[in-house]
From Swiss-Prot:
Record family assignment: Belongs to the EPSP synthase family.
Signal peptide location: none
Lineage of producing organism: Bacteria, Bacillati, Cyanobacteriota, Cyanophyceae, Synechococcales
Active site: 329
GO biological process: amino acid biosynthetic process; aromatic amino acid family biosynthetic process; chorismate biosynthetic process
Protein name: 3-phosphoshikimate 1-carboxyvinyltransferase
Amino acid sequence: MNAPTKDQSLRNLQKGGELCGKVKVPGDKSISHRALLFGAIAKGKTLIEGLLPAEDPLSTAECLRSMGVKISPIKKGDIIEIEGVGLNGLQEPQDILNCGNSGTTMRLIMGLLAGQKDHHFILTGDKSLRNRPMKRVGQPLKMMGAKVFGRCGGNLAPLSIIGNKLRGAVIGTPVASAQIKSAILLAALNAEGSTTVIEPARSRDHSERMLKAFGANLEVGGEMGRHITVSPGKDLKGQSIIVPGDISSAAFWLIAGSIIPGSELVVENVGLNPTRTGILDVLEEMEANINVINKRDVAGEPVGDIEVFYKENLKPFKIDGEIMPRLVDEIPILSVGACFCNGISQIKGASELRVKETDRLAVMARQLKRMGASVDEHQDGLTIYGGKSLEGCELDSEDDHRIAMSLAIASIMANSNSTLRRSEAAAISYPDFWSDLKRLQQKN
């Protein structure tokens, strides 16, 4: 099953076979980035257990090392040790900081560097990242006094940042984005006076939880916690962090277990932060057979195991802008799930997906149509007509990790075998995806 051909990026995908067993998804990508960044600017030692050893967090770690932060080698199963340098201890790097494919790395580091006075930094990334919008972060940072420059009026990398004296501000973000919010909060740690971020809707709150744990003077208020205020002056102190499993990675197994006949899965150690559990709400709307068990609290984050069993006659669903911040990364695999619902599913308010690693709305529509699905693409979403069988064919992840894994699940439900180009993209967030899929798949 799933053996790569001589071209390692081209993978053969076999149809059929239920998925059965237990799977532990890798550490949460969002939390992994933040643990590295906050540990770097804390005083003292930070220990991280369960850090995601995938390409995106590795990019963050390498950028921090280039600025003088000592981080132990990142290997699966190892506890990672960081020697923090304090809020103003980052060194001016001798070379360009390469963020790879990671938008989170670039955007959060922009906030981190904005207040490193008189230091000069240049950030770049791969072709995909160099075409993703950065002014949405640079503009609010400029309101605090940051000096940020880049291509296309500061919107595209490479970016040049000259550390400057920052001042606190009240900043309303145009979209509910944890990346924008977190960049501002990082900059606020080095500003004169308090900074308040006001979001149009609540986004994932890992930064707030973790900054509090590190000792930052941070308050959350306003309707639904949309106002976040940081007052500078307190040093961060190194912590011991345990990273739970990533619910965005778990989503592939939750949908697969729901749509593939005969499947029975337990996804273990999944982070259940309420700002991330929109996927569970949609599965409930689909009337999928899932149960959350062994609920517990780990290092300030709710965690549990999720059982999922195949169920016939899944209901179609509707997703709008209100829930979107809680499941934005799960839209590709939910699009696959919609193909096997009895009726028409609608996804709206998802225009943010057009500026991810790829234009995920266009790519999912294109690839699912190639398989014979009935999909209408709109400016801010998709309409998917369920109940139509899928055909095996030549598929392409277009270098997007979430697309690669979503198409892998879709291919199991096709009526003939498929191939997937650029399958290695899965390693961006889930290095063991293909081996886990092979282990879980039971051939008839």
